[in-house]
Amino acid sequence: LDLCRQTGGETSSLASSNARSSHTALVYRVGGFSFQKYCEWNEAHPAAAASLKENYNRITGIRALFFPTTDDQISWANNWHGNRDCSTIAGCTQTEIEGRLHLREGIEYLKKTCPYVFSDAYLVDVAPQLGVRGSHRLVGDYTMTYDDFLFHKKHDDVIAWHSTMCALNDRAPVEIPLRALMQKGINNISAPGRHMAADKMAIDSLNLIPQCVGTGQAAGVAAAVAIADGTTLRDVDIRKIQDILAGEQDVPLPRNVHTDISYTECAEEHEYGLYTVEARNA
């Protein structure tokens, strides 16, 4: 997004410390224990497992969870550093330092407290670069809001159709338009993924990996079509983009002849999630 900021066009930044986007991450891997065995122990001893996680997070100072990898003996730990603005040097530096500061102490605690699982646990590696969930965003030709979820808004320039983790519409698919990737007042530049134009609430449901992949793919196709046809991104043939995505790249899009109709039928059968209390009261 640095290029978009240098154009002189508008951008917006983080909302609040409570937002998911205000949590950075410095992920790491721990080896020497069986993730399957860990899961079985968790299930058999829920109270002890909850206490172990709580104390581990207290020692490291960061909320973290272990996830499986392709190797049962190596687990990946995701984490959430709250109230961090990764668009600032201070926010990035705090994550880099705090993410490593007490990590080995935490692993020693696991080894001593639960040797049945962690007796041989060791730190495999730490990510060489911090992870961000959000920073600056476009002020775009269209701004995604929770209205897109609560009212199932349809867009003629839809380029991605994704289920999200938003409970307002029971995680039903929402349409993301090309306009949400276009910087207001600036030609021939787009910013998909975590920098798309969305307000401070909606962005938390739109900046996960699936949406980053989907909007990134669409932005690439849009740029290729614009170059091939000699147009700007704003004047690009949206139908051609949609047909390439749905017809050649197997990307489901609503109201497109290349998309399996059963996807739409399923969404309609479930009312696009608009049966929730929040949607009915909107």
Model-derived segments and spans:
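Flavin (FAD/FMN)-binding glycine-rich loop and adjacent Rossmann-like elements that form
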Residues: 1-262
